[in-house]
Structures are given as C-alpha cells and as structure tokens.
A protein has these predicted regions:
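Residues in the helix-turn-helix
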Residues: 41
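Beta-hairpin "wing" of winged helix-turn-helix
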Residues: 50-61, 67
Length: 97
C-alpha cells in the first residue's frame, strides 16, 4: 500500500490520473493538457503509473494510449474508506463526551 501511496503522492501523477480517468488519451494529449511539464517528464510519470498498475496502455501505430485502471485502485479506496471511517468514529466519540 505504501508504494501505491508514494506513486500517487506526486501532484503531476494525480493530474495525469485525472486526465485518463474517464477516457483514453495519448501521451501527446496529456502533455498538451499540462504545458508546464516537459514531454519527457510526462512520459516518465506515465511509466511510473503504468509500472504501478494504475494505468493501462496500448500501442496504436507510433502512439501509446493510456487509461486509468480503476479496478486496481479498489484496494486503495478500501484502505482510505477504513481510515476515514476510523477518523469519523473517533470524532463522534469525542463529540459525545
């Protein structure tokens, strides 16, 4: 879990995940949406996300297309919901005192 959190801790990678959440995009489209980031940096972030299993990639000609692998984020979601639920339970207990 900690390695997954390390991967998504980078703001640029979170932005890339947001961009590929609902539709497939090629690396060039992702770079166009983030003009302040070099194409090389976008490629490196995509490689990290892909290695972590957070994005799927497919090649079509000379282009690579990326899409978020939402099903692989399930364990992270469950962990965050548990943490959030525990925090809310503690807050409720304190409020009732």
């Amino acid at each position: 879990m900690s390695s997954l959190l390390t991967v998504i801790a980078a703001p640029r990678r979170l932005e890339i995940l947001r961009l590929v959440w609902d539709r497939e995009r090629c690396a060039g489209e992702i770079h166009e949406a983030m003009p302040e980031v070099s194409f090389g940096a976008v490629s490196q972030h995509l490689r990290v996300l892909s290695t972590a299993g957070l994005v799927a990639q497919r090649a079509e000609g000379r282009f690579r297309y990326y899409l978020a692998r939402k099903e692989d984020l399930g364990s992270l979601r469950e962990w965050l919901e548990t943490m959030w639920g525990d925090a809310l339970a503690r807050l409720k207990t304190r409020a009732e005192l």
